Swiss-Prot record:
GO terms for molecular function: peptidoglycan lytic transglycosylase activity. It is found in: Cell outer membrane. Gene3D superfamilies: 1.10.530.10, Periplasmic binding protein-like II (3.40.190.10). The active site is at E314. In the N-terminal section; belongs to the bacterial solute-binding protein 3 family. Keywords: Cell outer membrane, Cell wall biogenesis/degradation, Lyase, Membrane, Signal. The lineage of its organism: Bacteria, Pseudomonadati, Pseudomonadota, Gammaproteobacteria, Enterobacterales. The gene is mltF. The keyword Electron transport does not apply. This is Membrane-bound lytic murein transglycosylase F. Murein-degrading enzyme that degrades murein glycan strands and insoluble, high-molecular weight murein sacculi, with the concomitant formation of a 1,6-anhydromuramoyl product. Lytic transglycosylases (LTs) play an integral role in the metabolism of the peptidoglycan (PG) sacculus. Their lytic action creates space within the PG sacculus to allow for its expansion as well as for the insertion of various structures such as secretion systems and flagella.
Amino acid sequence: MKKLKINYLFIGILTLLLAAALWPSIPWFGKADNRIAAIQSRGELRVSTIESPLTYARINGKKYGLDYELAQQFASYLGVKLKITVRQNISQLFDDLDNGNADLLAAGLVYNSERVKNYQPGPTYYSVSQQLVYRVGQYRPRTLATVNESQLSIAPGHVVVNDLQALKETKFPDLSWKVDDKKGTAALLSEVISGNLDYTIADSVAISLFQRVHPELAVALDVTDEQPVTWFSQLDDDNTLSAALLDFFNTINEDGSLARMEEKYLGHGDDFDYVDTRTFLRAVDGVLPDLQPLFEKYAQEIDWRLLAAISYQESHWDPLATSPTGVRGLMMLTKNTAQSLGLTDRTDAEQSISGGVRYIQDMMGKVPETVPEEERIWFALAAYNMGYAHMLDARALTVKTRGNPDSWADVKQRLPLLSQKQYYSKLTYGYARGHEAYAYVENIRKYQISLVGYLQEKEKQAAEAIKLAQDYPAVSPAEFDTETFPFSSFLSQPSSNYLSHSPSLPFSLKKKDEN
């Protein structure tokens, strides 16, 4: 997947270019007969979306997602409440606009020439490519020339239909596909993963998130180049909503909150490793259940799944792990660190985890208060890996190179420079393996995403299995077997660790109260 990047320059230029055109309607708060006035009179911003880990998800009453956070901030900016409506596919989203049931569509929708003929786009905030996917171990098509409708299904309203039609007319006359009116993109990706469908097409971000939980999903080829993602509203002569959106995006671009959200949701999607992800998920099944009670016991304000991800990065959950430099145990503590924490046996799982948490908390306490709460953990983990003094150097270097020392996105880009003489020779604490600290934190974030997503899916499967069992009360649990009922062995565990904690936002250190 190509590097995802918010189009800050585009937002700035578009704001300047359109401000003049929209100027008559910019004082939207003072008029009573425009779209913004209607939203404020109603007291709510109506946003339609599609449920996905990136756009919007609701787990046990907690909401998260890039589009959800942006929409929540925009509603607050307008002084109204946010009303979210979830639809199953893209066609239903645009139906909401056509029928006047939504003010905005915020669902990772791609900007294209056909859509803007009928709908008003907002600023673009990241970009994706459309990719053809297949299951690892199955035939990988290298071209669309021989792909047909018996193999390829896509979701209704998918933007790629126009691209496929153009390719059919210009390059691949035998290309054909089926639009599945009953399934959205996420459902079709699941069909490919299960082997019930050969191919589907999805955007690169959705695919990268699915791969963290389903490494068997593979990209066959890019169908399109990078395409900008935007929100959509109704197209008419009332430009007040467009003007408000432009002003809002310009504001969050300038104050840095847009960059923080990019880092939070899009800053760790590159460099998928099939073998590493598969190995990790196998360890989740085979090793984690024995260690989970300890992670939960000592995690305190740290999400236990984040703590588990840290430990896996350190030792692959091997209590006896030892490095050539002498660090040992689940949290790979040095002898001096262990002694300072009062530990007597670094290879004892409980001592190692409790000591590692205290050491991380010590690093957290040193991170300047100017660093946003949800990013403090990444600074602390980098310091945990390479030493806090070198983190100070990284922040100083970020300032010298005109970055924001309180932004993890900015600081992490400078970490590899700490091993280059032209930079470390001018820093207070000298040489550091900053590239290792960079990889260390990025790997932890990827493991955390995989773990949270995997456990969420396990919980969903278990809930579906329980519901199915309730629908057939005459059949006793003993009559189920793993061939005919694949989740029976999972359900037979009376107190599965996988279900002992409800899933929540995987991208933050602490859960936030819902507004």
